Amino acid sequence: AFSTCTGLTSITIPNSVTSIGDGAFYNCGLISITIPNSVTSIGDGAFNGCSSLTSITIPNSVTSIGYHAFWWCSSLTSVIIGNSVTSIGDEAFSQCSSLTSITIPNSVTSIGKGTFSGCSSLTSITIPNSVTSIGSNAFSCCGSLTSITLPNGLTSIGDHAFNNCYGLTSITIPNSVTSIGSNAFSNCYGLTSITIPNSVTSIGSNAFSNCYGLTSITIPNSVTSIGDLAFYDCSGLTNVTIGNNVTSIGSNAFNGCNGLTI
């Protein structure tokens, strides 16, 4: 509707509007926008490339945020997501490099693929207990993220979910998680401690590769498989305890762990 209107800096959407369509404001010059309470959905790429947009409030009426909805909104510093949103599309806030914090409401049950990838200024994130899955690349390359609390209902951590989050120093994985995806925490070289609970059965390939800040790791009895290169080049590791039920350890799983004693 207003795609590539680069001179458009502000707009008031009337209360009669119930949905914002796909690509509606793609690559616009918007600095601010007010979304009325009548809107229930924000379409795919609706505000994609609105690089001058600094803040957005998503009202409680909105239930879904589409794929790439705010992709490359590189000036966006503040986002308030309403309490009715149940799904956030893949890469919805990807490359929002100025975004410093965000609170995800209790209505959200899953975080999609690459949802916050490349949000390089993001320092904190609150994930509610309603979230059961974190998709692949969800927080990839969020290098300023120093801490994160994973919710108690979480069952899976996707591939590359936190890779290149080199600002992370510690993380506790809740007892509900059963699988840690490949490259889930790769290149998190600021990570000094990690707790893997007894619920986890598999650790993916490269899951903790290049986490050279880790000094010790305990793999619980619940784990049956450790993927290829899972702890590759964790050169700071001096102690690893492997549970009794591991039946397969992938190739080069501990390669480059030069200080390791088992």
Model-derived segments and spans:
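Structural signature of tandem-repeat unit edges
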Residues: 5-19, 28-41, 51-64, 74-87, ...
